[in-house]
């Protein structure tokens, strides 16, 4: 079975584009083949800074023949007195068949004319000729450029094209204005180590042929090589390094034939904060830092860079890199010394000159709002005076480092430098730590703030951002979320859950919106509604995806179009989490099955009544004198006994007490419905009917303290 090789040779591709392009082809090419009825044994996508390639093995020589049934006009329109009409003749002509091929068959809508049409499969070469340009031109990425004088865009100019179906060249042309790139079997090796053309004889020879030209086309193989080379090199230096995933991916996409190069810098730069030095190396120069072996991250005056040049010239390469990092570290040293010449608080006036967001004023204004929200959170948490003061101070200083020279030059160090400058300014450990922690988590897999002050300021900052951006009408839609508002809301919920902070989110949002609306003359009601709905969706997603709660149980605690549950969730994030987790637990251990039928059946029938959902005590809404069967009295007595258990569960949030009561009452409820003394709930007498619906409504209400059982699916 044939193999197919496509290689698109280019000028140096950006590392960010290459990774995305490889991922797109891995997903799209198999889909494209399947859509054209082409099978394959494997689809391997390769990429280096100068090429993007795909090697497909086990292709058929052609598509399978396709048989299809085509429906034509109604039989009565196609034939008259047994003779074909113009409608039948036209249908046969259009489908390219003789009249004898027409068949009349019955359908639900009467008799119609059909044909069985067989379409021969097309040769795979013809199909690939059509598909390849689509694969190339459909690639997405940032800052695509025109190449040639046509309108075709690609990440970088395309210089050569290899297209082989086994040993044969597949004739292809990429036309862009006056420039045409034709397919051939000629590729190119490493720009320095093997600049001469390389002839690829057969598609399956691609990987090894390019390896002979000092090009490792497999990105995963390059990654492994880099990790092994860096580990071996750092061991010789008597230290260790961290393999930063983003750095490793970027370096992998910058080299075709990796080789490690060791560089040095002056020990005087070790006096800089470690974070500054590693940021220069990792984020700006793409170096791997070298740490002393031990418990603490203490740097050694070395770095490792991965070169794409001639390994025999490593000393020359090292000198060039040393010159660059020396200048960068000298800048950092100057920034650090200059920044420390003033206290962190003295930078606050400069925040007035930095815009937070167009139409939302300056960073100084944002800081003032953060201070107010932090005070509201402190009040809700009923914190002592010391904690309140720490929260206010940290909120005031949390953005001050943004106008320092170090953070202006290295934005990745925001918060980190704020902490260090706060310590140098004599701020307390609680305040200093909170300045760096309030940014946490910085990403999906990052840690959460560990200190109370860091948690409070982090919540306040994000709540202000959410209210402010929503207030401008810039609400996330679909996959578009330029201000990372989903991540901010997720952080609010996750910080609250992880730290078990007893906050009323609905109240905080309302207070923050009120402040914003007064300052910017906005209508509060639609803004609060939008924020509440947004947070409810975030809670729903986090419960399902991070806490692994079944969707129906999430619906049961959040309610579906039930304001009572949605308000309760926003007023107490800990309670909604705990109820969802507990429901999942009793589903797993089988307890939910013991109460599901009785509670769910009661819930459905109770919907026909009008009992207030807050009512728990049967003595004021049930009339025992209307009982006609012992099962009613038994149900009533069981409900009376259940009241203190439910109230205790509400007060302590120990829902095991409630569920234990529901388990105990289940046989009594079953007897009410189906036992020897069962009753007809919908009795002809309206008073008896209402009395029985109230009994069922009471059981529903007790269960509602935990969840809306009407939303729970029995056999999920």
UniProtKB/Swiss-Prot annotation:
The keyword Nucleotide-binding applies. Its EC number is 6.1.1.14. One of its GO terms (cellular component) is cytosol. It catalyses: tRNA(Gly) + glycine + ATP = glycyl-tRNA(Gly) + AMP + diphosphate. Pfam families: DALR_1, tRNA_synt_2f. Its main location: cytoplasm. It is an enzyme of class 6 (ligase). The keyword Ubl conjugation does not apply. It comes from the Bacteria. It is found in: Cytoplasm. One of its GO terms (molecular function) is ATP binding. Keywords: Aminoacyl-tRNA synthetase, ATP-binding, Cytoplasm, Ligase, Nucleotide-binding, Protein biosynthesis. SUPFAM superfamilies: HD-domain/PDEase-like (SSF109604). GO terms for biological process: arginyl-tRNA aminoacylation; glycyl-tRNA aminoacylation. HAMAP family: Gly_tRNA_synth_beta (MF_00255). Tetramer of two alpha and two beta subunits. Belongs to the class-II aminoacyl-tRNA synthetase family. This is Glycine--tRNA ligase beta subunit. It comes from Nostoc sp. (strain PCC 7120 / SAG 25.82 / UTEX 2576).
């Amino acid at each position: 079975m044939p193999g197919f090789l496509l290689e698109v040779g280019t000028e140096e591709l950006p590392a960010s584009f290459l990774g995305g392009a490889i991922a797109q082809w891995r997903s799209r090419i198999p889909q494209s083949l399947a859509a054209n009825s082409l099978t394959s044994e494997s689809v391997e996508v390769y990429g280096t800074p100068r090429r993007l390639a795909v090697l497909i093995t086990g292709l058929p020589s052609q598509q399978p023949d396709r048989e299809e049934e085509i429906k034509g006009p109604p039989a009565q329109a196609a034939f008259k007195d047994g003779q074909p009409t113009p409608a039948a003749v036209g249908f046969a002509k259009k489908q390219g068949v003789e009249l004898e091929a027409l068949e009349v068959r019955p359908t639900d809508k009467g008799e119609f004319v059909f044909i069985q049409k067989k379409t021969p499969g097309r040769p795979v070469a013809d199909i690939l000729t059509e598909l390849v340009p689509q694969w190339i031109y459909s690639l997405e990425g940032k800052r695509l450029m025109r190449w040639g004088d046509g309108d075709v865009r690609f990440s970088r100019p395309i210089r050569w094209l290899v297209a082989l179906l086994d040993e044969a060249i597949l004739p292809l042309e990429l036309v862009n204005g006056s420039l045409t790139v034709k397919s051939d079997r000629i590729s190119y090796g490493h720009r320095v180590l093997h600049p001469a053309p390389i002839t690829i004889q057969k598609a399956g020879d691609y990987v090894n042929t390019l390896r002979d030209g000092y090009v490792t086309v497999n990105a995963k193989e390059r990654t492994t090589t880099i990790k092994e080379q860096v580990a071996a090199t750092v061991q010789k230096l008597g230290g260790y390094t961290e393999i930063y995933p983003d750095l490793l991916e970027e370096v992998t996409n910058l080299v075709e034939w990796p080789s490690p190069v060791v560089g040095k810098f002056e020990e005087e730069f070790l006096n800089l904060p470690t974070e500054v030095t590693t940021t220069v190396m990792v984020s700006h120069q793409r170096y791997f830092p070298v740490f002393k072996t031990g418990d603490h991250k203490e740097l050694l005056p070395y770095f490792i860079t991965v070169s794409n040049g001639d390994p025999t010239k490593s000393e020359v390469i090292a000198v060039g890199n040393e010159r660059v990092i020396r200048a960068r570290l000298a800048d950092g040293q100057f920034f650090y010394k200059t920044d420390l010449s003033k206290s962190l608080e003295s930078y606050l006036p400069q925040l007035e000159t930095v815009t937070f967001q167009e139409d939302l004023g300056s960073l100084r204004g944002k800081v003032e709002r953060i201070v107010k929200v932090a005070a509201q959170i402190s009040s809700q948490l009923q914190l002592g005076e010391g904690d309140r003061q720490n929260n206010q101070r940290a909120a005031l200083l949390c953005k001050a480092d943004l106008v320092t020279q170090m953070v202006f030059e290295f934005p990745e160090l925001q918060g980190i430098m704020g902490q260090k400058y706060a310590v140098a300014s004599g701020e307390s450990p609680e305040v200093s730590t909170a300045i760096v922690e309030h940014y946490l988590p910085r990403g999906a897999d990052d840690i959460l703030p560990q200190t109370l002050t860091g948690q409070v300021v982090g919540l306040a900052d994000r709540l202000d951002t959410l209210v402010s951006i929503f207030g401008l009408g810039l609400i996330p839609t679909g996959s578009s979320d330029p201000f990372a508002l989903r991540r901010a809301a997720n952080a609010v919920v996750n910080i609250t859950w992880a730290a078990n902070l007893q906050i009323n989110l609905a109240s905080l949002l309302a207070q923050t919106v009120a402040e914003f609306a007064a300052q910017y003359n906005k209508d509060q009601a639609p803004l609060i509604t939008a924020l509440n709905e947004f947070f409810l969706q975030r809670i729903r997603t986090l419960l399902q995806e991070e806490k692994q709660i079944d969707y129906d149980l999430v619906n049961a605690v959040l309610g579906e179009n039930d304001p009572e549950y949605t308000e309760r969730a926003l007023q107490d994030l800990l309670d909604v989490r705990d109820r969802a987790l507990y429901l999942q637990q009793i589903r797993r251990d089988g307890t939910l099955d013991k109460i599901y039928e009785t509670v769910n059946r009661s819930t459905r029938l109770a919907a026909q009544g009008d009992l207030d959902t807050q009512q728990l005590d049967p003595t004021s809404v049930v009339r025992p004198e209307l009982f006609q069967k012992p099962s009613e009295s038994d149900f009533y007595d069981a409900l009376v006994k259940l009241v203190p258990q439910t109230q205790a569960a509400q007060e302590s949030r120990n829902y095991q007490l409630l569920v234990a009561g529901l388990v105990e009452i289940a046989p009594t409820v079953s007897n009410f419905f189906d036992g020897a003394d069962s009753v007809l709930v919908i009795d002809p007498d309206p008073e008896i009917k209402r009395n029985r619906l109230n009994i069922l409504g009471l059981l529903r209400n007790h269960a509602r303290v935990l969840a809306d059982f009407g939303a729970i699916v029995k056999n999920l």
